[in-house]
Amino acid sequence: TGGKKDTTPPIVKSSYPTNAQLNFHQKQITIHFNEWMQPLTNPKAQVIISPNVEPFPKIEIIKNELSIKFKDTLQPNTTYSIYFGDNLKDNNEGNTLSNYKFLFSTGSFIDSLNVKGSVQTALDKIPDNTFVLLYKEKEDSVFTKKRPFYISKVQTDGSFSLENIKDGAYRIYALSDKNGNYYYDLPTESIAFSDSLTHVSSNIDSLNLELFLPEDTTLRIFEKDKTIKGGILHLTFNKELSFSKDELTATIIGNDAIIP
């Protein structure tokens, strides 16, 4: 019984503003679909906004309406790309609107430069959640401190495409992001990088990056993983520790801990 299974992906019926809108200065984007949609379970992980927006906007789907509410002022004269990947699905059959991207500019034109290429690895396959990251900052350690300006997810075949980029000089990295924060801050995260600044003044079609797992011989504590819960200090190091718990003592002096 029952009719033929619906396999048709959902369709965008309308949006405000329209896709590729210029001179956008509002705080909200609204997109309407032709049918009810599944809610997003983790928008910050499912939606890529490039350039990066902090704080991350409120993104939710209610019935057939998707809303994006920005919490702060956007940068002037900048093209923004909001990429949903394969995370827009209809409510009934889970049919996917694949690779949907919404563009807008806070200026009078859409930036149109692209950087494309491939990421290689010695592993059997590209790790899940591998991204290519572009930074405007020139220091070579920036990927351990800040979220990227532009970001693109690497496909399973290793290809990537960063689109609608403003001309300029960038640091470029690839990162197998284990914890979804777009920083290199875990010892199990593979990275790749270009040795020098990449100057984007025209399209780049064949940028190649090779992932590797850094061999860090210095014992380090990752700053973002210093947490205290219930009187227990949790520290994440960049390598395994070889002492037993009976060998470790600490002396607390004011705000400092001395570990002999």
Summary of predicted features, one role per range:
Residues 184:
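An amphipathic, aromatic/His-enriched active-site/gating alpha helix that lines ligand/cofactor pockets
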Residues 200-207:
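Extracellular interaction modules
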Residues 181:
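Acidic carboxylate motifs that coordinate Ca2+ or other divalent cations, activating on Asp/Glu
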Residues 1-157, 161-175, 187-193, 199, ...:
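Acidic, low-complexity Ser/Thr/Gly/Pro-rich repeat segments typical of extracellular/periplasmic
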